[in-house]
């Protein structure tokens, strides 16, 4: 797999920007793409008439990655929560539609035989409208369990 060099990426961004100046109604989407998935759009539509606070549970069965992999290096990959978990935080914020006002995060404690604990976390977010949600980002789940699951409860 080839990696994009910074210069090449900047060139592509510049081309897209120049093209967008010539064309009307151009949308540029970067990074947080889960909110544009058809099921999420449908979910957002179904929630539109529910103005009461929401309770959300997201389970991410991320799968194990060896401890020596670059994604676990804070200087290179940033860790799995920075690199991937942030997408679920964005998705939850999108579904609630209000600012995050507080959070609590807990990682798995150190235990014999557990090489990486930072990829087994619970993140609870509190929102300005009273909603809350918990993201279970887990690298120790079974492969038969779905990779991503979202449950939303509201009146």
Spans of model-derived segments:
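Beta-strand-loop-alpha-helix segment that lines the small-molecule cofactor/substrate pocket
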Residues: 1-32
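Generic recognition of short, well-ordered alpha-helical segments
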Residues: 8, 41-42, 118, 147
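Short helix-capping segments at alpha-helix termini
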Residues: 19-25, 49, 125-128
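Residues that form or flank phosphate/diphosphate-binding pockets in enzymes
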Residues: 4-5, 38, 144-145
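Hydrophobic packing residues within well-ordered alpha-helices of enzyme cores
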Residues: 9-16, 40-43, 135
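Predominantly a Rossmann-like dinucleotide-binding segment in NAD(P)-dependent oxidoreductases
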Residues: 26-29, 34-114
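Contiguous beta-strand/loop segments that form the cofactor/metal-binding neighborhood of enzyme cores
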Residues: 83, 90-155
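Glycine-/small-residue-rich active-site loops that bind phosphorylated ligands and cofactors
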Residues: 2, 35, 140
């Amino acid at each position: 797999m080839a990696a994009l060099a910074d210069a090449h990426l900047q060139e592509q961004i510049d081309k897209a920007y120049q093209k967008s100046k010539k064309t009307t109604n151009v949308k540029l989407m970067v990074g947080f793409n889960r909110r544009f998935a058809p099921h999420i759009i449908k979910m957002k539509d179904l929630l539109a008439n529910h103005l009461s606070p929401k309770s959300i549970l997201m389970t991410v069965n991320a799968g194990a990655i060896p401890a020596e992999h670059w994604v676990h290096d804070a200087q290179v990959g940033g860790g799995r929560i920075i690199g991937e978990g942030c997408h679920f935080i964005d998705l939850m914020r999108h579904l609630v539609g209000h600012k995050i006002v507080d959070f609590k995060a807990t990682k798995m404690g150190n235990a014999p035989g557990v090489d990486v604990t930072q990829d087994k976390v619970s993140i609870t977010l509190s929102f300005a409208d009273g909603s809350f949600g918990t993201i279970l980002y887990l690298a120790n789940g079974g492969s038969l369990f779905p990779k991503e699951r979202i449950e939303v409860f509201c009146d």
